Design a protein with these regions (language model features):
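Conserved N-terminal segment of EGF-like repeats
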Residues: 135-145
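Structural motif
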Residues: 9-13, 53-57, 96-101
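A short beta-strand motif characteristic of beta-propeller blades
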Residues: 20-27, 64-71, 107-114
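Short loop/turn segments that connect beta-strands within the blades of beta-propeller domains
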Residues: 6-8, 41, 51, 84-85, ...
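Beta-rich, blade/repeat-based domains predominating
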Residues: 28-44, 73-87, 117-135
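Short loop/turn segments immediately following the C-termini of beta-strands
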Residues: 6, 50, 60, 93, ...
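Short loop/turn segments that connect beta-strands within beta-propeller blades
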Residues: 16-20, 59-63, 102-106
Length: 145
């Protein structure tokens, strides 16, 4: 499991699901790290920092830390992030919007939904394979308990 902590110093950590093997991945250059998202395809951990106005990533073991997006790209207060396919999506509470861009290259930033949200925070993409289709819904509705 992975988590972020806004303490002094702010950090991003990981541990086994039973709490053992705790390890600090990042504890420098962070202030309000949040919105952790794992890209299983590339084995990367992404996060937003709402104070530094950046979206960064590293490998899931903490190596190879890189900045993907900054205030120079229009980020004002990124908070929640999620990964879907080749895209990263994030909420920005200062802009009251949801944005997307390519998860490896800071280009083609698009507004997905904008200007009518009030303090958007968390966001989660749901893989199409995990969504309920009509056949799955029919199966569930026919179950007897």
């Amino acid at each position: 499991m992975y988590w972020s902590d806004w303490g002094e110093p702010a950090m991003i950590e990981r541990a086994s699901m039973d709490g053992s093997a705790r390890m600090v991945l990042h504890n420098t250059g962070l202030t309000w790290p949040n919105g952790l998202a794992i890209d299983y395809q590339l084995q990367r951990l992404y996060w937003a920092d709402a104070f530094t106005d950046r979206i960064e990533y590293s490998s899931v073991d903490g190596t190879g830390r890189e900045i993907l997006l900054t205030s120079a790209h229009g980020l004002q207060h990124p908070f929640g992030i999620t990964i879907s396919g080749d895209q990263i999506y994030w909420t920005d509470s200062a802009n009251s919007s949801i944005y997307t861009a390519h998860k490896q290259v800071a280009s083609s930033i698009l507004t997905v939904y904008g200007d009518s949200l009030i303090l958007p925070s968390g966001i989660e993409a749901v893989d199409p394979d995990r969504q309920l289709t009509n056949s799955k819904l029919n199966f569930l509705m026919n179950l007897t308990f």
